[in-house]
């Protein structure tokens, strides 16, 4: 469309790179595709066009960037035009509206279970059907980190997510799509590291098959070793995954623990590695992992049952995310049980 061409031209004039790209509907909804399937594509949004997350406000139907946003006038005019013609306006915020409509209508017991098991942040319990919440959620779904600051990234944010694509790149001058071979298919990148299906749903409102699934909060005491294992149930990995309290107290605290994985034996390896500083034997660790995996399947299955009863015939992205995770954890549970049998035979 002419609107799209004008936006791309202005983007380039302001220092943006938009090589061989077009926008249209695909399997994942609206996305970015190559114009010429035999050539590579690239989007690079320079830092002068990055919009500070806290500088957007709603004025009537449109988004406005605050005067003290630090953006030059031409850049600000482009960003406002981009949001109002494409990203927020013109049904660009439709998916955010659908997510909020579904989430705010959920029965309180379901929301409370989601929060108790750390599938959502407690701030999501305050979501309302209001313009303020719509904008807050819209920004959260699109925010990138650049030099320690939360920013929105016009043009680059139109690229859809795949867990099996490389991540977007942060350079000194801005953010860009990862290099990829020309194969004619939709341009995709990974939004963030080791996402689980549930953390994708929480952060972006959609579900997708993921490589790993993380455990809910638990505290289990192994009496014969006078050791308590506590997991805080964070739904994404941590750089320092283990916080060992002094071993005399016999408490081992973990922020996040993989319980299901495409590499089906990885959860057991992770737990064995965490407990390698203790005296706990392999058989006890395998039994503990089986207990944790069953607990995680059970909790998700109960939640899914409640959800499906509430949703009747429509299947939400949340239901899909729970189903993905249950399957992934079940596969890993089978692998753990096989390892236990092998070691016992």
Describe each PLM feature range:
Residues 1-23, 84-194:
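Catalytic core of the SET domain in histone-lysine N-methyltransferases
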Residues 49-88, 93-97, 101, 117:
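Phosphate/adenylate-binding glycine loop and adjacent helical scaffold
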Residues 1-36, 41, 46-55, 197-345:
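Charged low-complexity "KEKE/polyampholyte" interaction tracts
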Residues 75-88, 194-198, 228-233:
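Noncatalytic linker/hinge segments flanking ATPase motor cores
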Residues 77-85, 134-143, 286-294, 331-337:
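Short, hydrophobic/amphipathic alpha-helical patches that form generic packing surfaces
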Residues 61-64, 175, 207-210:
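Short, low-complexity, polar/charged sequence segments that are solvent-exposed and flexible
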Residues 7-11, 62, 66, 79-82, ...:
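Generic structural signal of hydrophobic/aromatic residues within well-ordered alpha-helices
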């Amino acid at each position: 469309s002419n609107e799209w061409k004008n936006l791309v031209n202005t983007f380039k004039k302001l220092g943006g790179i938009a090589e061989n790209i077009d926008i249209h509907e695909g399997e994942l909804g609206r996305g970015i595709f190559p114009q010429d399937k035999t050539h590579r594509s690239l989007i690079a949004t320079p830092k002068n066009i990055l919009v500070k997350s806290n500088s957007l406000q709603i004025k009537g139907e449109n988004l406005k960037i605050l005067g003290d946003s630090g953006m030059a006038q031409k850049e600000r005019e482009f960003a406002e035009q981009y949001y109002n013609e494409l990203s927020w306006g013109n049904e660009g915020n439709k998916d955010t509206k659908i997510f909020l409509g579904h989430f705010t209508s959920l029965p309180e017991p379901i929301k409370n279970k989601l929060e108790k098991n750390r599938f959502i942040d407690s701030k999501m319990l305050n979501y309302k059907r209001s313009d303020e919440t719509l904008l807050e959620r819209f920004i959260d779904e699109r925010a990138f980190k650049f030099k320690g600051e939360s920013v929105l990234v016009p043009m680059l944010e139109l690229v859809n997510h795949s867990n099996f694509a490389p991540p977007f790149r942060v350079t000194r001058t801005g953010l860009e799509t990862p290099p990829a071979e020309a194969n004619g298919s939709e341009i995709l990148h990974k939004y963030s590291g080791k996402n689980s299906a549930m953390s994708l749903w929480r952060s972006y409102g959609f579900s997708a098959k993921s490589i790993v699934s993380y455990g809910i909060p638990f505290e289990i005491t192994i009496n014969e070793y006078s050791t308590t294992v506590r997991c805080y149930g964070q739904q994404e990995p941590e750089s320092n995954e283990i916080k060992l309290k002094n071993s005399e107290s016999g408490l081992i605290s973990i922020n996040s623990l993989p319980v299901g994985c495409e590499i089906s034996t990885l959860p057991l390896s992770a737990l064995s590695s965490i407990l390698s500083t203790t005296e706990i034997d392999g058989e006890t660790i395998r039994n503990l992992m089986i207990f944790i995996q069953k607990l995680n399947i059970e909790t998700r299955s109960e939640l899914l049952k409640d959800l499906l009863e509430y949703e009747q015939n429509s299947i939400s992205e949340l239901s899909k995310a729970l189903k993905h995770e249950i399957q992934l954890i079940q596969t890993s549970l089978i692998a753990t049980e096989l390892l236990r049998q092998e070691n016992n035979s």
